[in-house]
Amino acid sequence: MSPSVILLLSVCVYLAIGVPVAFALGLSTVTALLVSGSFPMLVLLKETFTGIDSFPLMAVPFFILAAELMSGGSLTEVLLKFAGQFVGHKRGGLGYTNVVALTFFSGISGSALADAAGPGSMMIKMMDKAGYDRPYAAALTASTAIVGPIIPPSIIMIIYALADDNVSVGALFVAGLIPGLLIAAAMCVVNWYISKKRNYKGDGQMPTGPEMLKTTWQALPAILLPVLILGGMRAGWFTPTEASVVAVFYALICGKYIYRTLEWKAVPDILSRSALLTASVLLIIGMSASFAWILTIEGVPQSMANWITSIHLNAWTFLIVINVFLLLFGIFIEPLPGVMVLVPILAPVAAKIGVDPIHFAMVVIFNLTLGMITPPVGGLLFVTSNVSKVPLTELTRELKPFLIAHGIVLVLLTFVPALSNWLPHAMGFK
């Protein structure tokens, strides 16, 4: 039996018995090496280290730290107030506020789980007190939180660029803007429909002009973080890795000296949380790298490319097949290891049959992220269920219209490549 077959069978077994993803990838690599005897065990250590020995990867801990610092500076309350002033007075206003606030927060956190656990949990409580059904509030939060990995800066996009040499971090950051806003717009449409159907009321009166200017001025430093990152990269002031360091200093200044809510005594806890999250990310990346190395050495990507060529799939048919596969795969595997394992295999195949690399990247990232809210085992569902105290069955029932909306967005992203690649190409990214 070939090492690649042993590898794939063993990882399925380990995942089925509940082994965490990072350890399942590592253990399956060990199993393949031991049973096949084709490679020395040193491969595991070498490829694991090689997988995390990357300069662009240094951006990950700094973006994580920047998000923690901004959250520690009570950014959530500022963004909720800013978002609410524009849409809070409308029918279903708190639902719109939820979507807008989470979209803005995505430009800081880059994480769906952070969005759901942070501002999302606050919005669920606010919506519950205002008379919204709590399961609906939780479903709206989970469905909107997946904007986190789409809106820049996104950790998943950094990892994707590491796995595919044909795209840059900057190009992916810019490529995520239109799809991210499209997802947010789709969630607003669903909220409009449900709010009208259930007669959810607005939240008070629209604020006056001076009040709106004051709130906007307060939120401006936080809103400018993604602009600073993308603008600085486009102007050539700094690379994505350097941008992450700039983001940390900017977040520190905002939290300590602008919003004045970040205390020095809280910094050690913030550093500790950031270090733990970074360690978990790097562990997954390292284990995924050794896993993917065996598949590559065994010629799995080339074999798949040859097979697809032999059955004469065109680019559109290929994308349809990939969508189905990734949706199923994303239900059981989180986006981060999914990108590390699948992209080295699928990206060369997509390029060979003429799919634009940036377009393909957005299709892959959105599919895997969508798996986080797809029953029965979407990871984001469990987080949202936990913070909202809503049973998973009730949360799942409320998800149906949101999943339909996400499906429509996925179809648009798949068959309208310009939604993904027009802006990066227009800004000079390749």
Question: Locations of the language-model features?
Answer:
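Alpha-helical transmembrane segments of multi-pass membrane transport proteins
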Residues: 1-430
